[in-house]
Curated annotation (Swiss-Prot):
One Gene Ontology term of the molecular function aspect: ATP binding
Positions contributing to ATP binding: 9-16
Family membership noted in the UniProt record: Belongs to the ParA family.
Gene3D superfamilies: P-loop containing nucleotide triphosphate hydrolases
CDD domains with a match to the protein in the record: ParAB_family
Protein's name in the database: Virulence plasmid ParA family protein pGP5-D
SUPFAM superfamilies in alphabetical order: P-loop containing nucleoside triphosphate hydrolases
Organism lineage: Bacteria, Pseudomonadati, Chlamydiota, Chlamydiia, Chlamydiales
Amino acid sequence: MKTLAFCSFKGGTGKTTLSLNIGSNLAQVSRKKVLLVDLDPQANLTTGLGVQIQDDHSLNEILRHSNEIRRAIHKTKIENLDIIPSSVLVEDFRGLDKDISLSVNHLHLALQKVQDQYDVCILDTPPSLGILSQEAFLASDYLVVCLTPEPFSILGLQKIKEFCSTIGNNLDILGIVFSFWDERNSTNSTYMDIIETIYEGKILSSKIRRDVTVSRSLLKESSVINAYPNSRAAKDILNLTKEIENKLFSDEKLVQETL
C-alpha cells in the first residue's frame, strides 16, 4: 500500500477537494483499492462523500486505540473507495499541539494492519502543523503539497519542511500541486518559478483551474468526474490523478515492461 499525505500550511488550497477527487479517480478510473483517512476535525472529506459520522467508529477510535482500525473503516458509494471518517472528538487532539512529543504513532500502527487490503491510502491532513499532522506524516511514504499561487505558499512550504525535520521524518515530496490556477495572471507563474528554484522538479505539471463545478459536486456529495464529467475541473483533476499514479507506481510499471 502506497500512503501519501495531502497537506498544506493553511486552508483554502483545495487540499480536501483533491483528496476526495483523486481518491475517487484512482478507485473508479484506475481500479485501485483506495482508503481515505480524514484527519481534519471539520470532517469535510467525510461529509463530502456522504458518510455519516459515528464518533465510536471513526479516526477518534484509532488515535486512542490503534487496534480498532477495521471497525473505523466505512464503505462509500464509490466502488473500491473506503474511508476512515473524522469526528468532532478528533478536535481534542488539537489541544495537544503544543507538545508534539505526546503522539504515539497510532495511525501508522493501525494502517499496517490493513496494508495488504489497499493499493493506495490518502491522508487528508488539517491545515495546521500539530499532532494530527504528525500522525499523518509518520504514517506516510510521500507528501503531496497543495498550494495556491501566492506569496504565503513559499513560507508554507518551508514550514512543512521544518516540521518534517522536527518529527524526524524527512518525507519525499511526491509533488507540489497548484489549485485556483489562472494562466492569464502573470503573477501565478512568478510564484511558481520561485518555488521551482527551491524545489526543483517537484512541481507537478497538472494545474487545477478555478471551476464552480468543484463546489457544486460537493453539494451533491459526489466527485467532480461523477457529477460533471465534461467539466474543466474533471479534466484537470483526471490529468493530475494520472500524473500522481505514474509517480507512485513507476517502479512497478518498469518491472512489468522488462518481464
